[in-house]
Amino acid sequence: MNHRHRKLLHALFSHPLPTNLDRHDVETLLGEIGATIDRTSHGRLMIKHEGHSVSLHASERELSKDDVVHLKKFVEACGINPERDFPI
């Protein structure tokens, strides 16, 4: 995982929640950690990793705060800790 992806993963867990996360960058990050990403016919992204799944809006360029919260919970449920697994 390159430095840009690590910074993005750490930003996901920062406080306050970031509102400028680019959807394409997040898709690339999730691909790096081994998640599978499928586009549904309803304009959503279905992300699956280690038996966990989350659905995000795919139509917007940046993720909404709700999507960021769902994504953060998904990453935590998958057992990924950015401080431990991917230090900057």
Question: For the regions a protein language model found, what residue spans apply to each?
Answer:
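Basic nucleic-acid-binding interfaces
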Residues: M1-I88
